[in-house]
């Protein structure tokens, strides 16, 4: 019983973190086409639970200041580098960390030994699972909230994929995963 009590006590001391994820770059292998991205990036904005409320309030203030009624989206800034620098400067006071995985699709093409990656759904699942696996390894108590991708059926299959490809569960681990629409969640917009 002492061991179980110590386990519970330890779990209470471990701080929960939240990771809000979004992707940049699209699926597609015709990278010579200027409309097809050469890289695929998945970013997680990581926030400690005690900072979550302040993070959300400050992110919403940043959204209102720089994007008015729209979403925080890098594509809305485009090539306006002065505006991008103003947004980045205002990120300074917001409590969060960043974890990103950047995939050079040229390297994937050169090493296309995993034939399944040529299919869109498989590609998205595989790439997102890399991020999710690393986050679960780094944080014992984590809630991952990803931007919705595809339809409901795809998101359900993605959740099953993540669950079936996770490492062996650890006694102290507590990982949760869900999808939210970034249009309704400024926290996910911050990952854009």
Residue ranges and their predicted role:
Residues 1-192:
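Phosphate-ester processing/binding pockets and catalytic centers
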